[in-house]
């Protein structure tokens, strides 16, 4: 089944960057800020259009739009709006960098960003990360992770995965399924290196075939095998790859659910997914969320510990309930 991503944010038409720039300036000028105007303009435009508005704003007012937004806004609402103003790949690089900065590493964020990307998407992230932070992503990651988890992420980041233009090969899928079976359920202990190699090298369409063949061969799903054979971060990373191969929308729907159903709300994850998927497949994620959890994502965000302009910005990005 081919994945059909549907976004919630698209190009606005008609589009007048100069008028938008003036509306934004008026919303931030003088005493107080008109947050609703900011939401209406920036959520209602695509990222490319926001970059045009930013350029026009600077040309017309000799001011930096993002700096003005940072001065006027605060807290989680600012995080959403500033996130929307960043080119998508830069935004993900910033999130990766933040996940590895300071004490401890947010492995779940690394998994969410790195294990869900095609090789083509990964190449862009690697290039922008190094340009922005003057350090290769693989090197930074190696210093923050360890063991087979580090090995898997390193393989993914170094771009060994076959591109989407590589034809799927049923014969090879049978062979890869047999290798996974021999490396896991068919033996005492687990040969993680075999799992790492196949999970990081094969394209997503090829892996879909491998997982089907695995079920035929072993009578078990690949998820069951991973649950038995892996633990901790490696388990999470493998499961993320499997979920994204089968349905990226289901993977992100589950991540959003967990972000809102723990002790308190994981705002960073909530913001990152809603902002970064809004122009890719957020509409599809909404449909999957409702299918899996029997409630709308819109209502879940409204009921989560979100409030004020922050809540309004998130629900605006989600589009119609």
Swiss-Prot record:
One GO cellular component term: cytoplasm
Highest taxon in the source lineage: Eukaryota
SUPFAM superfamilies xrefs: Annexin (SSF47874)
Annotated Annexin repeat ranges: 15-86, 87-158, 171-243, 247-319
Keyword terms: Annexin, Calcium, Calcium/phospholipid-binding, Repeat
One function term, GO molecular function aspect: phosphatidylserine binding
Coiled-coil regions listed in the entry: none
Gene3D superfamilies: Annexin
Presence of keyword Cell membrane: no
Family: Belongs to the annexin family.
Domain notes: A pair of annexin repeats may form one binding site for calcium and phospholipid.
Name this polypeptide is given: Annexin B10
The species this protein was found in: Drosophila melanogaster (Fruit fly)
